[in-house]
From Swiss-Prot:
Protein name listed in UniProt: UPF0102 protein PBPRA3228
Entry similarity comment: Belongs to the UPF0102 family.
GO MF term list: nucleic acid binding
SUPFAM superfamilies listed in its UniProt record: Restriction endonuclease-like
InterPro entries, per database record: Restrct_endonuc-II-like, tRNA_endonuc-like_dom_sf, UPF0102_YraN-like
Domain of life: Bacteria
Gene3D superfamilies tied to this protein: 3.40.1350.10
Species annotation: Photobacterium profundum (strain SS9)
Length: 125
């Protein structure tokens, strides 16, 4: 019997994005888009929470020796997410003045894949 090949980082990321999307759907968010990519970066998931557009960064850490999964979303990553989100809004003819939106992080941690959901996480400045 042949054992399955190990997943590369991209494939692993897709597995965790699906887990995060399903988790958010169980909490009544609706999927809009996955893996929006532009020059500024990538947004893992774009969801809707009623009338609010939610830009979601999904992070996984097997161990927390170098910080938790949530801590991996540093200021630089947040700025990339913000630029990508503003471009997505523009591409979808949505204005920042008339569209409610926020940035969430879904952190998947450890061998038991514990999920934590942090809402409205963007640090201004």
């Amino acid at each position: 019997m042949v054992s399955p090949l190990p997943l590369n980082k991209r494939q692993q990321g897709q597995v965790y994005e699906v887990m995060a999307e399903q988790y958010l759907q169980r909490h009544h968010l609706k999927p809009v888009e996955r893996n929006f990519t532009c020059r500024s970066g990538e947004i893992d998931l774009i969801m809707r929470d009623k009338s609010c557009v939610v830009f979601v960064e999904v992070k996984f850490r097997k161990q927390n020796h170098f910080g938790s999964a949530a801590e991996a979303v540093n200021w630089r990553k947040q700025q990339k997410l913000k630029r990508a989100a503003l471009l997505w809004l523009k591409k979808n003819s949505l204005s920042t003045e008339h569209t409610e939106f926020r940035f969430d992080v879904v952190a998947i941690q450890g061998p038991d894949q514990q999920i934590e959901w942090f809402t409205n996480t963007l640090v201004e400045g």
